Amino acid sequence: MPVPQPDGKTPAFGNLYAIGWSAVNFLVLLALMYKFAYGPINNMLEQRTNAIEGSLKHAEEVKLEVEQMRKETASNLAESRKEAQEIVARATKAAEESKNEIIAKAKEESTLIKNKAAAEIQAATEQAKLELKDSAVSLAILAAEKVLSRAINDDDHKNLVKQFVNEAGDLLC
């Protein structure tokens, strides 16, 4: 606002004078603020910028570490799964081998038992044949003695026995 003069008129340059002083005051205030306030504010903003950049770098490093740990964990998990599969495969193979071994032993034992039984049957059959021949010889001698009503001498006895055994052997076998 223009300042009125004592004569009541407002000078034309009165406002200019006030504007000039306002400009000078503004420039002085600006210089003082630049000197005393700009430096600390600028330093504070720079520190804040550095802190934010540091936090971002740290966050990026943490992100990379987490990614690396995730990859290692995935790798370890895959390796563990592979080891588990190998253990299962080895156990399955061992079980299969054990089963085959047990089956082979059982077959071998059954073959031995069967062969032993066959040998025992064969021996019993041979024994029965011998006993049957002995019985047949005794019966033949008795029958011959009764038929001839006399005792048979050794040569006759041997001839009769041989003949009877041969005939009986043909019939039995």
UniProtKB/Swiss-Prot annotation:
InterPro entries membership: ATP_synth_B-like_membr_sf, ATP_synth_b/b'su_bac/chlpt, ATP_synth_F0_bsu_bac, ATP_synthase_B_chain
GO molecular function: proton-transporting ATP synthase activity, rotational mechanism; proton-transporting ATPase activity, rotational mechanism
Segments passing through the bilayer: 12-34
Keyword Secreted: no
Coarse class of the protein's main subcellular location: membrane
GO CC annotation: plasma membrane; proton-transporting ATP synthase complex
Superkingdom, natural source: Bacteria
Protein keywords: ATP synthesis, Cell membrane, CF(0), Hydrogen ion transport, Ion transport, Membrane, Transmembrane, Transmembrane helix, Transport
One of the Pfam families matching this protein, by short name: ATP-synt_B
Membrane association type: Single-pass membrane protein
Compartment(s) of residence: Cell membrane
Disulphides: none
Residues in the signal sequence: none
Subunit comment: F-type ATPases have 2 components, F(1) - the catalytic core - and F(0) - the membrane proton channel. F(1) has five subunits: alpha(3), beta(3), gamma(1), delta(1), epsilon(1). F(0) has three main subunits: a(1), b(2) and c(10-14). The alpha and beta chains form an alternating ring which encloses part of the gamma chain. F(1) is attached to F(0) by a central stalk formed by the gamma and epsilon chains, while a peripheral stalk is formed by the delta and b chains.
HAMAP family: ATP_synth_b_bprime
Family: Belongs to the ATPase B chain family.
General function of this protein: F(1)F(0) ATP synthase produces ATP from ADP in the presence of a proton or sodium gradient. F-type ATPases consist of two structural domains, F(1) containing the extramembraneous catalytic core and F(0) containing the membrane proton channel, linked together by a central stalk and a peripheral stalk. During catalysis, ATP synthesis in the catalytic domain of F(1) is coupled via a rotary mechanism of the central stalk subunits to proton translocation.
Name listed for the protein in its UniProt record: ATP synthase subunit b
Organism the protein comes from: Syntrophomonas wolfei subsp. wolfei (strain DSM 2245B / Goettingen)
Annotated gene: atpF
